[in-house]
Design a protein with these regions (language model features):
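Conserved helicase/translocase motor-coupling segment
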Residues: 1-97
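C-terminal accessory regions
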Residues: 65-166
Length: 166
């Protein structure tokens, strides 16, 4: 199954409730997802992939804790049974096609270089194909008090994914 939510707590509960026995689960995000920090998702924190993938459920560094997030660089070529995919405003759906952005200091900047656009799209492709059994996609509600996380940055992507019956 693939589900879609705007509530990170719901996403974490769903992932935990579906994993059985030794099935592995974890949280992933694109390396450019800079504005998920208000949710304690910081892609700049460099996980140790060995600890994240191999350590057990009692180790806070492991994927089991759903605290440290793996990016496309950490997870490429590897799979988890269940994935909590976090989606930021670096890749936004619009009626005219995808909008590609990079966060710099205090605002989102448009990515105009086609090669960098392909890289960003491929980062999301990598992340969206890491789950063996199921996935839940978390897209934030947005915050009208924060122009770097406004609802307008997140709503179009959420609404588009809803049309796909996710």
């Amino acid at each position: 199954p693939i589900l879609l939510t705007r509530n990170l707590s719901v996403a974490k509960s769903w992932i935990r409730s579906h994993a059985r026995g030794t099935e592995r689960y974890g949280m992933v995000a694109a390396s450019g997802a800079q504005r998920l920090k208000p949710y304690a998702i910081d892609v700049r924190f460099n996980i140790r992939p060995k600890d994240w993938f191999l350590n057990g459920p009692t180790d806070t560094r492991s994927s089991w804790y759903l605290e440290d997030v793996a990016t496309e660089f950490h997870i490429q070529g590897l799979e988890l049974d269940w994935v909590l995919m976090t989606w930021d405003a670096d890749l936004q759906y619009s009626r005219s096609g995808w909008k590609y952005r990079k966060f710099r200091a205090s605002k989102w900047m448009q990515v105009k270089n086609e090669e960098r656009q392909r890289y960003l799209l491929n980062a999301y492709r990598v992340l969206l194909t890491r789950a063996r059994q199921g996935m839940i996609i978390f897209i934030p509600e947005g915050d009208s008090a924060d122009p770097t996380r406004s609802k307008e940055l997140y709503d179009p992507t959420f609404e588009f994914l809803q049309t796909l019956d996710i």
